């Protein structure tokens, strides 16, 4: 009969060297105030009135806990559920809670609509800077935020559609539930 091989952890781990030239994890810093090019561009392009809010947002985005949300949202990929447990077609995509937290923050801070709801000089600059800071944490959620932002000018070309959809599009409350749009036949 074969006898299991007894091995100690050091038997399979190579003893090489102690690395000394590695950087530390970049966290717990202000993504806005530490970015000289961004802070200068915001002022140059007329968004200086938003610098304080950008600084607060940059500090929040740069915390270790918040940066971890970005890693989690990428580590745990969305999962497609094509059918429910009874076999009915659902075609629902399920996202990790970290993704929803990132989306919630983006919506609450108006990354999806602030220049449309609070227009003025530099409004697009401040919104772009907020978006730039937030997508450094995780870029994937930037797509639905940007598509939502881009939808409103097009909808406003048809006032009856804008009247129907604009309140929901510009709302500062994130709703992670899946909704289906009305059928064209209804």
Regions found by a protein language model. Give the residues of each.
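Extended, charge-enriched "interface" segments that sit outside catalytic cores
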Residues: 2-120
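Internal helix-loop-helix
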Residues: 77, 83-175
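Conserved small/polar residues in nucleotide/adenosyl-binding loops
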Residues: 179-186
